[in-house]
């Protein structure tokens, strides 16, 4: 069985959301506004992978990713 550290998993989730945001031609500001997540939270997530479950689900609801 392959184990992935939680930090690596979080960073991969952040990469997926970022890629989907770019595919949708959304800026960070645009995604933050549409999702109701603060811009600083989104930036931190894309850089470090750190985010609350609630904020992650909000981003996911917009990106479908």
Where are the predicted features?
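A generic secondary-structure micro-motif detector
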Residues: 7, 45-46
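Short C-terminal boundary/hinge segments that cap the last helix of small helical domains
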Residues: 64-65
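Short, basic-rich loop-to-helix N-cap that marks the start of a DNA-contacting helix
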Residues: 48-61
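Short alpha-helical DNA-recognition segment
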Residues: 25-43
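A short, Lys/Arg-rich alpha-helix, primarily the initiator
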Residues: 1-23
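Helix-turn-helix/winged-helix DNA-binding modules
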Residues: 23, 34, 48-51
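Residues that mark the N-terminal boundary/hinge immediately upstream of a DNA-recognition element
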Residues: 16, 27, 52-55
């Amino acid at each position: 069985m392959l184990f992935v550290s939680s930090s690596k998993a979080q960073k991969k989730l952040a990469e997926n959301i970022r890629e989907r945001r770019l595919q949708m031609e959304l800026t960070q500001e645009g995604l933050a506004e549409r999702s109701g997540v603060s811009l600083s939270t989104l930036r931190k997530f894309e850089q470090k992978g750190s985010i609350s479950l609630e904020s992650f689900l909000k981003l996911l609801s917009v990106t479908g990713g």
